[in-house]
A protein has these predicted regions:
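FAD-binding core/adjacent interface of flavoenzyme oxidoreductases
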Residues: 1-9, 67-156, 232-240, 251, ...
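Beta1-alpha1 glycine-rich phosphate/pyrophosphate-binding loop at the start
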Residues: 4-68, 72, 144, 148, ...
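A Rossmann-like FAD-binding core segment of flavoenzymes
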Residues: 68-90, 95-97, 174-261, 357-389
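Predominantly flavin-linked oxidoreductase catalytic cores and closely associated redox partners
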Residues: 104-105, 111-208, 213-222, 289, ...
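FAD-site-proximal beta/loop scaffold in flavoenzymes
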Residues: 114, 136-146, 249-300
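Mid-to-C-terminal Rossmann-like scaffold of FAD/NAD(P)H-dependent oxidoreductases
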Residues: 304, 312, 316-386
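Exposed aromatic-hydrophobic patches
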Residues: 362, 394-406
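Short, aromatic- and glycine-rich surface loops/edge beta-strands on solvent-exposed regions
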Residues: 374, 404-422
Length: 422
């Protein structure tokens, strides 16, 4: 059985950035396993711009952004296998995978970086009544059809869900000549970035209906129309608010699910809120030497933040391999406690002796809060109290903690992160 220092599962933006980072931190024996026919992951179908402003200080399209990292991977001589499906990873970090060239094979890894990304929530998870006619697509499938395959999914479109992919596809379908009649969102707020609402809906005169959902789909062979209804505070349709829209296509942008079947199979502890692994300050899971980064850990807004997180995971995996897999003592872990409006934090625990000089704690809120404060309490003492005009679930928030700051509290047990009103 062949042994590698680091095996990276997934060749998308997270996997590529983690590989480059591990190589730059002194590890030569790296393998990327990617199930698609090319590296780059979802970026290959994201032909719009808006990528790279943080990482490269310039605006790039998705394929351009991926291309920068793919070039680095090739220049650094990092090995990768395409069209390769990882079937299983054991607790001892034996990776079982298969492809056409090698058949079914096993690899022993000293460290594993999970970078599988996420998948879209399908129609089946929504329980929409009606037949199953042609013309219902997830927004990402429609994006692939239009941008890569060169097929037009339909001419009259309704979009359910205001996640970033749905907003971007509203603009894309309009540019391709379709009529996007409405974007409906179940929640009383949009799930996407503010800039996407402005650039993709407002600029094209596409209406956004908040607190609305699809309650019926018309058509047997092909979608002929849908019925929208307003929902109450519990998400239940309000009788008498129904509106009919004729359309031949319904796109669903109703959330993303981190793809963690392999992680669960190997015994990684999961966070029920993010559907991703629980990680410490090194982005390491409960299994020593298994790290996670990118959308498999929690769903990000910007690929730049995925790359930043993956860079840290690559560096920490390299440090683990160099230390010959010696586990660090975890007795004095500080637990991060998200409450009062904060849904989760990544990481979930911090060991001060193990962390870099600064750590970024990322989190999402559970609703829209205006004129509020993002606060962090070190046990009972409020240390961070930052004014924010508005925070919303569609935009990831972050606070930065320094090692110097944490060392001033030697007995610190809990950091509580919450939203406070004036």
């Amino acid at each position: 059985m062949k042994t590698y220092d680091i095996v990276i599962i997934g060749g998308g933006p997270a996997g590529l950035a983690a590989a480059v980072s591990a190589k730059n931190n002194g590890i030569d024996d790296i393998l990327i396993l990617e199930r698609d026919k090319e590296l780059g992951g979802i970026l290959n179908q994201c032909i719009h711009n808006g990528f790279g402003l943080h990482t490269f200080k310039e605006e790039l399209t998705g394929p351009e952004y991926a291309g920068r990292f793919i070039s680095q991977v090739k220049e650094l001589g990092i090995e990768y296998k395409l069209n390769t499906m990882v079937m299983d990873i054991s607790h001892e970090k034996v990776v079982t995978a298969m492809n056409r060239e090698d058949g079914l094979f096993e690899i022993q890894a000293k460290a594993v970086i999970l970078a599988m990304g996420c998948r879209e929530r399908p129609r089946g998870a929504l329980n929409i009544p009606g037949y199953r006619p042609a013309g219902i697509y997830s927004a990402g499938t429609a994006q692939r059809l239009v941008n890569i395959e060169g097929f037009m999914p339909g001419r009259e479109v309704v979009i359910l869900g205001s996640g970033d992919i749905g907003l971007i596809m509203a603009r894309r379908m309009t540019l391709e000549g379709a009529k996007v009649k409405v974007v409906a969102e179940l929640m009383p707020y949009s799930g996407g970035l503010k800039r996407n609402i402005v650039q993709c809906l407002d600029d094209y005169g596409i209406p956004l209906k908040l607190s609305h959902t699809v309650v019926d789909i018309k058509g047997k062979e092909r979608v002929e129309g849908i019925t929208l209804a307003e929902v109450d505070s519990k998400g239940k349709p309000i009788p008498g608010t129904e509106e009919e829209y004729s359309c031949d296509t319904l796109l669903l942008s109703v959330g993303l699910i981190p793809e963690n079947e392999i992680s669960k199979g190997m015994g990684v502890d999961m966070n029920p809120v993010t559907s991703g692994p629980k990680v410490n300050e090194s982005l390491e899971t409960n299994i020593p030497g298994v790290f996670a980064c990118g959308n498999v850990l929690h769903v990000h807004d910007l690929v730049d933040f995925v790359s930043e997180e993956a860079k840290a995971a690559g560096k920490n995996a390299a440090a683990y391999v160099k230390a010959d897999g010696v586990e660090t003592a975890r007795d004095n872990d500080i637990v991060l406690n998200p409450i009062e409006g904060v849904r989760y934090t990544v990481p979930g625990t911090i060991n001060v002796s193990n962390m870099d000089e600064q750590i970024t704690v990322r989190f999402r809120v559970g609703g829209v809060y205006k004129n509020c404060y993002v606060s962090a309490y070190f046990d009972d003492e409020r240390v961070i109290h930052r004014k924010r005009p508005v925070v919303a679930p569609g935009e990831m928030e972050e606070i930065k903690l320094t090692k110097e700051q944490l060392l001033q509290y030697p007995d610190l047990k809990t950091i509580t992160v919450k939203i406070e009103q004036e």
